[in-house]
Amino acid sequence: MLVPIVVEQTGRGERSYDIYSRLLKDRIIFLGGGIDDNVANLVIAQLLFLEAEDPDKDIHLYINSPGGVVTAGMAIYDTMRYIKAPVSTICVGQAASMGAFLLSGGEKGKRYSLVNSRIMIHQPLGGFQGQATDIHIHAKEILRMKDELNALLAEHTGQSVEKVAADTERDYFMSGEEAKNYGIIDAIVTRNVVPGGAN
C-alpha cells in the first residue's frame, strides 16, 4: 500500500511527513485493518507517546477494523485505560469484533460513529489442534476470555452481562443508531468532532 506524503511549509522550509505521522501531530491515531501484535504495538507506542506529550489532552482513535487477535486488542484496550489522557473513539467504515470492543472502551461521552459505519460484536474465535489435554486447556482459556470480554462490554454499554452473552453467541451486526441504543457509542456524527481538526 502506498502511503501518501504531506508537505508542510515551516519557518525552516518544507517538511514532509507520511500521512499517519502528520495525523499524529493532531493527536489522531488510525487503526485500520486487522488487529495483531504488530498493529497493537504501533498503536500502543502512539498512545504512550501522546500521553507523554500532554496527559490532559484528548487522543482520537479512528477505527476501521474487522477485529483480530484478542490478546493484541486487549493490549490496546489496557493501554487506553492505563494512560491519563482521555481516548475518544470514532468508527469509520466498520468496527467488528475486537474493533467494536475498542470502540466501546473509549472515553464515555466521546465514542462516535460516522453515519454509514457498521459495528459487529461476537464471541472470541479460536482454533487449536494437538493433544486432547492441550485442546482442553485452550478451550478453558477461550471461555475465560469470553466471560471477561462480555463483562467488560456490559460495563461499557450498560447492558446486562446476560444480554451481552446472548447477543455475542453469533455475529451481531448494528448500524450506528443501533450501536448508540446498545451503548457501544454515544453519538453518530456527520461533521468532524475533533478539536483543531478540519471542520
Swiss-Prot record:
Keyword terms of this UniProt record: Cytoplasm, Hydrolase, Protease, Serine protease
Gene: clpP
Protein's UniProt name: ATP-dependent Clp protease proteolytic subunit
Substrates-to-products reaction catalysed: Hydrolysis of proteins to small peptides in the presence of ATP and magnesium. alpha-casein is the usual test substrate. In the absence of ATP, only oligopeptides shorter than five residues are hydrolyzed (such as succinyl-Leu-Tyr-|-NHMec, and Leu-Tyr-Leu-|-Tyr-Trp, in which cleavage of the -Tyr-|-Leu- and -Tyr-|-Trp bonds also occurs)
Lineage: Bacteria, Pseudomonadati, Thermodesulfobacteriota, Desulfuromonadia, Geobacterales
Cited function: Cleaves peptides in various proteins in a process that requires ATP hydrolysis. Has a chymotrypsin-like activity. Plays a major role in the degradation of misfolded proteins.
UniProt-listed GO biological process terms: protein quality control for misfolded or incompletely synthesized proteins
Subcellular location: Cytoplasm
Residues at the active site: S97, H122
A GO MF label: ATP-dependent peptidase activity
Xref: CDD domains: S14_ClpP_2
Family: Belongs to the peptidase S14 family.
Pfam families to which the protein is assigned, alphabetical: CLP_protease
SUPFAM superfamilies: ClpP/crotonase
Enzyme nomenclature, EC number: 3.4.21.92
An example Gene Ontology CC term for this record: endopeptidase Clp complex
PROSITE patterns in the record: CLP_PROTEASE_SER (PS00381)
Keyword S-adenosyl-L-methionine tagged: no
Subunit structure: Fourteen ClpP subunits assemble into 2 heptameric rings which stack back to back to give a disk-like structure with a central cavity, resembling the structure of eukaryotic proteasomes.
InterPro entries: ClpP, ClpP/crotonase-like_dom_sf, ClpP/TepA, ClpP_Ser_AS
Entries under PANTHER family matching the protein: ATP-DEPENDENT CLP PROTEASE PROTEOLYTIC SUBUNIT (PTHR10381:SF70)
